[in-house]
């Protein structure tokens, strides 16, 4: 007896990819994610490949994973995919301490973020 299949978290013609612990602030990641929202998937990959932002590499990996999920798991046409959603949120925070003068210490915050990319197959306009 197999496990019951989990319900889909996205629509019928959509595919999803998530990265839960990406090292970097959500503000910087959101600047990069804003570049690809609403774009065609191939165009978005090109934008991220040639971006000078350091966070573009992480967003590109998640987008490539979403495209691969669409092709392999949901049998969607890769050439007709558009980026429906590219959202960024906060994840865990790693806290470290640095020593300071006079025997004191200060806290260093190292933020992590999560990226969620949804691609959708665009219907051809007739």
Swiss-Prot record:
What is the protein name for this chain?
Answer: Large ribosomal subunit protein uL22
Matching entries from Pfam families are given as:
Ribosomal_L22
* Molecular function GO labels: rRNA binding; structural constituent of ribosome
By sequence similarity, the record places it as follows: Belongs to the universal ribosomal protein uL22 family.
Superkingdom: Bacteria
GO cellular component terms, alphabetically, are: cytosolic large ribosomal subunit
Function, please? This protein binds specifically to 23S rRNA; its binding is stimulated by other ribosomal proteins, e.g. L4, L17, and L20. It is important during the early stages of 50S assembly. It makes multiple contacts with different domains of the 23S rRNA in the assembled 50S subunit and ribosome. The globular domain of the protein is located near the polypeptide exit tunnel on the outside of the subunit, while an extended beta-hairpin is found that lines the wall of the exit tunnel in the center of the 70S ribosome.
Specify the species. Answer: Zymomonas mobilis subsp. mobilis (strain ATCC 31821 / ZM4 / CP4)
Q: Which GO terms describe its biological process?
A: translation
| Keyword Ribosomal protein belongs to the record | yes
